[in-house]
Amino acid sequence: MRKSKSNAMLRGLAASALVLMVSATAWGQKVKITGTVIDNTNEPVIGASVLENGTKNGVATDLDGHFTIEVQPGARLKISYIGYKNKEVKASNGVQIMLEEESNMLNEVVAIGYGSVKRKDVTTAVSSVSAKDLDTRPIVSAAAGMQGKAAGLQISQANGQPGASPTIRVRGTTSLNGSNDPLYVVDGVPMTNIDFLAADDIDNIQVLKDASSAAIYGSRAANGVIIIGTKQGKAGVAKVSLNAHYAFNTVRDNQESLNAAQYKELMDEIGLVKLPEGLKDQTDWKDEVFRTGNVQDYQLSITNGTDKLRYFISGGYTGENGVIKKSSYQRYNFRASVENDIRKWLRLNASVTYSDYTNKGTGIISGAGSNRGGVVTAIVNTPTYAPVWNPENPSQFYNNFYGVNITSPAENIARTQNNKSAYNRLLATGKATVTFMPELTYNTSLSFDRTQGTITNFLDPISTTIGRQEFGTGYDGRDISSVIVWDNVLNYKKAFGKHSLDAMAGSSWTQSKWSQNYINGSNYANDLFPTLNAANKISWTGTGSSASDWAILSTFARLQYNWNDTYMATANMRADGSSKLAPHHRWGYFPSFSGAWRVSNEKFMKDIKWIDDLKIRGGWGQTGNQSGLGDYSYLARYKINRVQWFGEGNDANATPTFSQGNLSNPELTWETTTQTNIGLDLTVLGNRLTFYADYYYKKTKDMLMNITLPAGSAAARNLTYNGGSMINKGWEFAISSQNLTGALKWNTDFNISFNKNKLESLSLTQVYYEATTTDFVNEQVVRNTPGKPLGSFWGYVAEGVDPETGDMKYKDVTGDGLVSASDRTYIGDPNPDFTFGLTNTFSYKGLNLSILIQGSYGNDIYNVSRMETEGMYDGKNQSTKVLARWRVPGQITDVPKAKWDIRNSTYFVEDGSYLRVKDISLSYDVPRKLISRFGLTRLQPYVSATNLLTLTDYSGMDPEVNQYGNSGSVQGIDWGTYPLNKSVVLGVKVEF
């Protein structure tokens, strides 16, 4: 009986085992699924991720959108692609999956410094510029591509010199003597400029505008932070992309000069020059200066990868010939990045970026104010009777101007045509990410950033007047800088119930080294050998070397808390220790706090269906600025004074002497900016309309100032100290709308920024004068003092031309019956009331149109060029505007007489407001079915026009210029500045 029961039990166990084996075998037999992923225009989506739900089993779609994957029976597939909504479907053979475009910007991932969050969870003031925004325009400068795209970001192109960097301000100017440039962070590496970076390599840009977001970067973030993420390799099918374009550039030409007869008549009235009769027009100086410039840009990239290994490689060439002859720029760029998942818990990244860029024809050609405004004003100032070359000596430029000191624009160009600056930059970064557990990760990165530069100048001893006086001059300067950054960051993310916590702590070490050597030479025999070994005299005072270094050690932390996506709070703290400061002032602490309330998640909002998201934000924080500090500013530094050892009566054994160059100041510290921000985010109508509003108030204190003490009052006269404060406050608004979403799509993005700047206080010196105008007037036109906006113009109030005398009447401000220096007052403000940008994009069946309009309102320009071209104070030629000058008593005109009482005054202050059609781009995506036979996945020819139309009352060549470039204390000065270009661009984008 027992045996029978045992046998029955064994038979049962065997049967059960057999069933389990059969079931396991059946389960292990995966099924092969094929399908296609398309978009809403029935075009294949290349590289879309197709993942078996709940597993890591996945593939990517090929060039035709097809995929093949083996999955378990009954599995579901999850399909995702950037810019489209994720979609989940049941796995079935031959399935066709259509992805819809992602219209909800709230799910966009935003970089916030050492981390990222979704746009909907941002508690601070952050603006975004996407690769799509850059892709619609043929740009070569990454910085210029942001113009008009983000509220609170004021970008102006100070001059049109090839390769010139734009001026960027985030919420106004914060420093009088330090840098006002934002901090750039490229793939986690902080840096001061991005000239080396090709716009085609950029994937996304985030602008941290308020202190509560930027404080995580501490003492370098007072001017805002621009975080740039570059394109990385993606798993899927290999993709090769080519973007090539060619541009034709012209200049806005609105300056006309007097002809020979008109010029002689003017000179007779002034009485300084006696010209002979019968002078004839010989030269149109515009033709000798301007040309049709061109830009050619070619960018090639390759990306490929698997779920374990991904890479991205790009390279390109940019070449520009400026609209002023002999000026040019060229850049070669290369970048490679690789990402490897070595283990499930270990990911390694490595990237190398190299750029080689060269500027030629820099110096006077850019209008540095020397030689009466340089090339541009010389076009008007040079008489038309003069030839280019001296008929009696054809190797020399003509300079017989009957005793008048005039240098023709052609000679001005020759003086700088051999000026060249060449730089190469290498940025190498290695990163490792260790995942201890899903909630806990550790990131370490080490980067090396090296820039090497060579600046050479040569002025031949024959063709130019100054060259003959100096017997030719040469210069060779070499500098090299290297920056090492080592970051270590620990992140912890945990969600439990309605609560989520994101904690981060880390450290950063930065070391910078710089060195320079330079040689000046002169006395060349001819122009055949421009190198210094052909110079017979090497300057004993203009030759030398220098070096410096600095370092920062930092620790930082951030804590983010989110309850039910309704209440959010963020706290940051960073401590920076800088070698630029004395030991007892070396460390600074920069805290910030921010919070947000998603009102739309409250119960009382549930019945309001047209509101998709409503969030109120607020934040406070502190940031620093140490850019105005030299590497050893707190120490007393000494100058080396060389003693001439050669020549009769000199000691051949003479040694140099030393003198103190500045006073030490161990109390120096960095500038500190405290900022408060309140904002509102609103998304309505099914995510089709998004509105952002922000109000901010930021105050900078302990501004870095320089003072020159009276002679003999101390061991040295120069002192750097902290003293003074400045305020910026304003409003920002941004609106994005999807106006049409059918076959015809129309999207609009608009932003506008209002900023008010005021220099609140100064210590020691209460007034700083800057920006001397013409040698004849010899007065400074900028006066910075408490209570006024930075860079305000200072001078006399012009009240029109006296009909009886022809002189300009100036206002007696003091009322003492006399017009004297005490009657000078504030006459203009270069800061705009507001700046704006408006982008409209249209697309229909592959045809795409993008229109960008941007502008500025309320800013004044001091037009020093007019002082040279309408001043009538010496023997230079003038513009045709002086034909309306006063000549006889009783004449009513707004142009004074020849040789009038010219002064810095409101007569030369003009409204610099403008509205500009910055870019119009039209492109066409050739249908896939027409190009697939050639192995292509994308073919997009395009045409674009840049700076096509400018509406302005400004009489100069362009209202966007600033002679003093990136200066914070001097703005809105036009003195022969290199004009901006109008461009027509033809290009093509190809992918295969």
PLM regions and their residue ranges:
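A generic beta-sheet turn/junction motif
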Residues: 41-43, 52-54, 71-72, 221, ...
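Short, small/polar-rich motifs associated with maturation and membrane association
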Residues: 1-335, 340-355, 364, 368-369, ...
